[in-house]
Amino acid sequence: NYNFLYYLAYCNLTCAVAREVVEHYGDRTAEHPVGTGPFRLAFWKRSSKMTFEPNPNYREDLFDGTPPADDAAGQFILSRLKGKRLPLVDKVEVYVIEEPQPRWLAFLNNELDFLERVPNEFANVATPNNELAPNLRKRGVRMERTAGMELTYSYFGMKDPVVGGYEPEKVALRRAIVLGQDVGAEVRIARKNQAITAHSPIGPGALGYDPDFRSTATEYDPAKSKALLDMYGYVDCNGDGWRDLPRKSAADECRPFTIEYASAPSAQQKPLDENWKKNMDAIGVNMTFRKAKWPDLLKESKAGKLQMWGLGWS
């Protein structure tokens, strides 16, 4: 496997470190990253700030690149930096600003030099018609628009008694929920057209990505969703407007059926939740939301306590 060494050094996947590091830090190993990159972690305050300083042991590495001839911005950067030794700066400070409005205002107020991405809520203001706004251009702001190597998805807790399992009715339930979710509306409304529909687990920029591949995994068909739910007994048996769990016979009592989706209490998450709620209402599925901070949800997820949650990788 020619990619094996790459996998060992790819921290999003494995990030292998010396045994002594793990033995010394134990469960806190992730708080003490060890690597051979251009920077090392100098300060970290959870959910607040990280400071990186140059790694004195970093190898000799000179800036280089091969931007296309028609990439004016790339050619300009190359002309200024080609041949200079990396890293180019003495310190990098990363601030964790969870809410989009304070993050955007901090950038406008020159408190930040770089914003990784424009918050979706301000995309139409900052980049009308996907072009940098004239007022920002006058201030010397530059924008680089790329398809990020990132993929977001929603998962089902496969050990959950309601949505998990491999019985035919459970498989049908998960398929029905997927068929009832309008991903196109999520892209247009919740993500302000700053995303594309994923048709595979491989995102743009990753080896194996095929922009022409189309999958039925993101098919939106509420009629088919309702038919599947009806077929496997997820029907409204008490007339309250919501579907109930399947019954073995008509004489059995109705059992309420609710899907709980975990999500963070953020402005960015709100339109995503609203899209889910609207879509599930349309097929008669009662969806509620489990609100908690991301680190807390991660702990619950690892413990197998979440029915559904949205995650991603980049």
Please give the residue ranges for each predicted region:
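Short beta-strands and strand-coil junctions in structured, solvent-facing domains, enriched
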Residues: 2-6, 59-61, 103, 113-115, ...
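Surface-exposed binding/hinge segments that line
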Residues: 1-22, 27, 35-51
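Append "and occasionally in soluble cytosolic enzymes with long acidic Gly/Pro-rich linkers
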Residues: 43, 48-64, 76-83, 167-278, ...
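Extracellular/periplasmic solute-recognition and catalytic clefts
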Residues: 42-53, 80-81, 93-160, 184, ...
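Periplasmic binding protein-like
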Residues: 131, 261, 279-314
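A structural "hinge/loop" feature
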Residues: 2-14, 36, 155-157, 164-167, ...
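Short, well-ordered beta-strand elements
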Residues: 37-40, 50, 89-95, 255-264, ...
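Short, hydrophobic alpha-helical packing/hinge segments within bilobed ligand-binding/sensory domains
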Residues: 103-104, 173-174, 297-301
